[in-house]
């Protein structure tokens, strides 16, 4: 099952969105929670990348789970395990053709 999520995060203390070997990115903490829920590694694809210390509101990502979880339950489950600085604002099922990397972006 493919999901779309809308994420908000305070980038303070993070190396940016993208996973990095020697630092903690937001992607890493989200993927750790998804792996916990799925029981195996899950890759999330984000709509863009942010630099270290940059905040995001309305950041979009997509991923696949083999164990279906209703979107409202997914939001609650993820937020219960994520740090307070990272929140899942909304989750929904996504069409197979949806790709968060291909949507528009705006910087403020």
Briefly describe each language-model feature range.
Residues 1-107:
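Structured-RNA-binding interfaces characteristic of tRNA pseudouridine synthases
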């Amino acid at each position: 099952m493919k999901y779309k999520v809308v994420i908000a995060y305070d980038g303070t203390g993070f190396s940016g969105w993208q996973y990095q070997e020697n630092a903690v990115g937001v992607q890493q903490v989200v993927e750790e929670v998804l792996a916990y829920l799925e029981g195996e590694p899950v890759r999330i694809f984000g709509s863009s990348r942010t630099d270290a210390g940059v905040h995001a509101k309305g950041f979009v990502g997509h991923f696949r789970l083999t164990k279906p979880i209703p979107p409202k339950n997914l939001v609650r489950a993820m937020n219960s395990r994520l740090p307070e600085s990272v929140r899942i604002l909304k989750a929904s099922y996504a069409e197979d053709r949806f790709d968060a990397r291909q949507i528009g972006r705006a910087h403020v």
